[in-house]
Amino acid sequence: MRREYYDDPDAPEPNSLVVATSAVVLDDAGRVLMQRRADSGNWALPGGAMEIGESLAESVVREVREESGYEITVTGLVGTYTDPRHIIAYSNGEVRRQFNVCYTARITGGDMAISAESTEIRFVDRREMDGLPMHDTQRLRLAHFFEQRPEPYLG
């Protein structure tokens, strides 16, 4: 199980620091590729932890492939999300301070496939997002994407 905290005085102290990537991937109708996480039940952009030996761009390409079945090409940067008030606690005792680099990307191949990390994966219309269970940090990344900022968010 996984529990996310944001600006919560009751959040546990982190015992690890993790670099992670995520991507906003659209279909032809402008819907966003999202997964319902098996560990929390929340909806999220596909993404995950960077592995030793890979670049940030390689990390997001691998994570999207593993979690969705799609091959992607990175097309831009939504932003960097490094707020120390965002803590993620796992049932195995890991409590991470995670920072995330969120990209934009387009699909170049593959077929949709659900991984063990998800219970559902699909393209979600923007108007539907408010009704989905989702952590505020995911909503922030999506808001920045939809704002079509001239420069990436650096925070």
Q: What are these language model-derived features?
A:
Residues 71-80:
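A short coil-to-beta-strand element that immediately follows conserved catalytic motifs
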Residues 41-42, 112-155:
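Nudix hydrolase/Nudix homology domain
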Residues 25, 102-106, 123-125:
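Short, well-ordered beta-strand micro-motif
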Residues 82-111:
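Active-site-adjacent beta-strand/loop module that shapes the phosphate/pyrophosphate-binding cleft
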Residues 27-67:
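Conserved Nudix-box catalytic region and its N-terminal flanking loop in Nudix hydrolases
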Residues 1-22:
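Acidic, metal-coordinating catalytic segment for phosphate/diphosphate chemistry
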Residues 18, 38-40, 45, 72, ...:
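Short connector loops at helix/strand junctions that flank enzyme active sites
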